Amino acid sequence: MDKWLTSNLVSGSVVGVDPHTITREEWTPLQTALSKAKMQLMAVDKNLVDLARFQLKDLPPERPHNNIMHLPIEYTGKTSGQKIKELRDKMAEKNVSALVITALDEVAYTLNLRGSDINYNPVFFSYLVITPTSVVLFWNDGKIPQDIRDILMEEGVDLEGRPYEEITDALTKIARELSENGDGEHSIWLSNEASEAIHRAASGEGDLKKPLNLVSEMSPVALAKLVKNSVELEGFRQCHIRDGVAVVRFFKWLHDQIDGGTAVTEVQAADKLLEFRKEEKYFMGPSFETIPGAGENGAIIHYSPSRDGPQREIRANDMFLLDSGGQYK
């Protein structure tokens, strides 16, 4: 993109970008490339595409805010309190005063919570900010269900809830307070893959009385997730067994149907596989939309059969591609 912009725009051009939609890792090289071409990269206050959609009465979809659930220690092998203690130890090693977690899977992992805001992904739209004395979840309207709060309190986490939209203002406030109360020794840790908007907020929007360091590197949660404990490993093994049973039962059913002369469409096959998976213990849902490609359809990347109109039947002499997955506790 930077090559196209520098080749097609004249010197002195200003390129506007919504900082919520681009990571710091993407922003920095783009800014450098434009600067070399005597151009400017500017963060726009409001997303211009969204503004246009409002004017055209084609409203952007609302952000989902489905219920969240807690995953007990028999599945995770570690309480959220243990995980947060380890993160605070890492923070102390780097002498940081706040850790900002922006990746949705990392928030879910840290708190042992799961959601369903994104299809086929057990995550929920949120941010998590950890300090030596507080744990704040920016989620939905900030009203965390009491049962979730009680469970986390039992695990040693006094979770505070704040509205999702308040994250940038909250980070700016934290940055300014750390700057005013220190002498350059305070810092905030956040991943380079966080949005440019989050980085700007954590920098106090450039309005700090004293220096504030930003530790912009891989999140410690990402590293913690790499090392699986014994409970997680055994969970993986058992999930593979259960899912394998469902898939074997499905193929046995499919062969029986076709050998017996019963017509089976791609859609019917996908639905039957889901039925078998639902019968397995701890099944939570598919991990992506099943791809049941019969014959020539098996060559189509990310194929998805239509439920409307004619249905492709799976014939006895067809090559049949089945790409599917399940998620379990």
Model-predicted regions and their roles:
Residues M1-K329:
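Active-site neighborhoods and metal-handling regions in enzymes and metal-associated proteins
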